A protein has these predicted regions:
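Gly/Gly-Pro- and Ser/Thr-rich, intrinsically disordered tail segments characteristic of DNA damage-repair
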Residues: 1-285, 289-292
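DNA-contacting surface of Y-family translesion DNA polymerases
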Residues: 8, 229, 237-387
Length: 387
């Protein structure tokens, strides 16, 4: 069987890069965040430009965290400045770094999601110049997987050369650069991009490409921490693993081959994670049997319909009830239109990440039934805290 070569390509701070390019600014040297400052400062930044991230700001910071971090940076700059005075400010990072008398500044760009989708479509057309659609799997608006196995002979290029050619074409076409990971399966390509590309020096165009195979993955990343850096390992998984003495992918791999009498063995992983332990074990060893063809052919057993609203301020029970009513109406109409019924209702409320699930005795599409259930959830979760 022919070995596969996959690449995972991620557009660098995509939303922020689009906003920079449209202002005729360099995405790599412009301090910019994408956020709706018309809301409160608790609003989440959808993107932070690479140069601004270098000041210790995360890619998913809330706007008030950006304000605080920039204020701390400027307090230190003022202390170090001649005469302890800042004479101006700039969002152009090279200028800030060259002139100690300037305060760090940044641009706040309001998000334009429909516009970003148009840009993503334009970039997808660049991928199609090199790879057929059946060998491309869009993972998100700014990230794709590609199987380039059958194209290397066609273009007479190595995997790295073809990957770099595609990225440079994106840069030439849009002004946006990208990072990429390469590997013999989807998982290793993704991890090479997520972790490996961060530690690879950028070339003159800002391009970073990292590559992993099973053996280099084990050599380089079996001791890597934290576990949450790895694809599909969230905080819940990491906390559960650490509670049982597993802190790295190497620990998980060793656990999977433990003897039956040992505390750390495969049975422990299945006890902790059920059938999902199989995926975790495979990934610990650098294995991933799923292909792009498998991903494209996947059809979920269950369907879900979602209605959501972002509240601009805290709501009391009566206001929340009105919102629930509107959402119940919308969901009921959607169910009727699709000729469906449901036996489960999920309501997610607020910053507390409280999720309530009610299983229904009889399937329904009635907005009245769903409203009653939502009121029950709201009464349980919110009524005792009306303010």
């Amino acid at each position: 069987m022919k070995d596969h070569t996959y690449i995972c390509c991620d557009l660098k701070s995509f939303y922020a890069s689009v906003e920079c390019v449209e202002r005729s600014l360099d995405p790599m040297t412009t301090n910019l965040v994408v956020a709706d400052k018309r809301r409160t400062e608790k609003t989440i930044c959808l993107a932070v430009s690479p140069s601004l991230k270098a000041y210790g700001i995360s890619g998913r910071a809330r706007l008030f965290e950006v304000v605080q971090q920039v204020a701390e940076v400027n307090a230190k700059r003022k202390w170090d400045a001649p005469g302890h005075q800042l004479t101006g400010s700039s969002w152009h990072d090279p200028e800030v770094r060259q002139n100690p008398s300037l305060a760090l500044d940044y641009i706040v760009a309001p998000p334009r999601m429909a516009h970003y989708i148009d840009w993503s479509t334009k970039i997808y057309s660049v991928y199609l110049k090199y790879v057929a659609p059946e060998d491309i799997f869009p993972y998100s608006i700014d990230e794709v997987f590609m199987d380039i196995t059958n194209y290397l002979d066609t273009y007479k290029m190595t995997a790295r050369e073809l990957t770099r050619t595609i990225i440079l074409d994106i840069l030439k076409t849009t002004g946006i650069t990208a990072a990429a990971g390469m590997g013999p399966n989807l998982y290793l390509a993704k991890v090479a991009m997520d972790i490996g590309a961060k530690h690879v020096p950028a070339d003159e165009y800002g391009v970073r490409i990292a590559q992993l195979d099973e053996m280099s993955y084990r050599r380089q990343l079996w001791t890597h921490r934290p576990l949450t850096d790895f694809w599909r390992v969230g905080k819940g998984y990491a906390n559960k693993l650490e509670a049982h003495g597993m802190y790295t992918m190497g620990d998980i791999a060793r656990c999977s081959i433990g003897n039956a009498g040992d505390y750390h063995n495969e049975e422990l992983l299945y006890k902790l994670f059920g059938v999902n332990a199989e995926i975790l074990i495979d990934h610990a060893w650098g294995w991933e049997p799923c292909t792009i063809a498998d991903a494209k052919a996947y059809k979920p057993e269950n369907k879900s319909i979602v209605s959501g609203q972002v509240l601009q301020c805290p709501y009391d029970f009566q206001k929340a009830r009105l919102v629930a009513r509107e959402m119940a109406d919308a969901l009921a109409l959607d169910l009727v239109d699709k000729r469906l019924v449901t036996d489960q209702l999920v309501l997610t409320v607020g910053y507390g990440f409280q999720i309530a699930v009610l299983d229904l005795r009889n399937p329904t599409r009635s907005d009245g039934n769903m409203l009653d259930l939502k009121q029950q959830i709201l009464a349980d979760r919110i009524a005792e805290h009306p303010e």
